Amino acid sequence: MAEPTPVGREIIYCGVCTLPPEYCEYGGTTKKCQEWLEKKHPDLYARIWSPEALEAATASLSLAAQERAAKDAAKKAAKAEAAEQKHADKLAKSVVTIKRIERNKRKFVTSVTGLEAFGLELKKVAKDFGKKFATGASVTKVPSGGEEIVVQGDVSGEIEEFLLEKYKDIPEDNIELVEDKKKKASAG
């Protein structure tokens, strides 16, 4: 007699923190996880986050432990919200600088700084620039401590358009075009 083939259990994972919904409370994004779960799986939300379910879960705790758990949850939520706000402010203040630098006579290089603030891998972006503009593009360290992408040729305008088109998370207002000219030696 053939045994029935075992069927795998279907597990739902949170769309926000990627943990099973039962463990979302241990992550830092509990509020967002609850909203996601309520929208996508209302039956599971009712089972985990309904007032009755929460009451049943905390009923076995002592009064002091319940208060401590409530304080911890509030503190964790506030901390996560503050971190998210800080990240949003950092992104709003971050500026991508595209600088056209004259090398000699009619030769130029274009320097791009500030992309790391938007979570982009500079090596991948440099490779994309090299492919798109058919030029050499490399990541170099800046004396001030950061890194920049140096692209051979005068492609500053095209780089701005490319960044806006390919990387939608960079706002247009945060891109700054700058032109550096070498000072001519005075004949005297």
Curated annotation (Swiss-Prot):
One of its GO terms (molecular function) is mRNA binding. This is Translation machinery-associated protein 22. The keyword Cell membrane does not apply. NCBIfam families: DRP1 (TIGR01159). The SUI1 domain may be involved in RNA binding. Coiled coil: none annotated. GO terms for cellular component: cytoplasm; ribonucleoprotein complex; ribosome. GO terms for biological process: formation of translation preinitiation complex; nuclear-transcribed mRNA catabolic process, nonsense-mediated decay; ribosome disassembly; translation reinitiation. It is found in: Cytoplasm. It holds the Pfam family DENR_N. Its main location: cytoplasm. Interacts with the 40S ribosomal subunit.
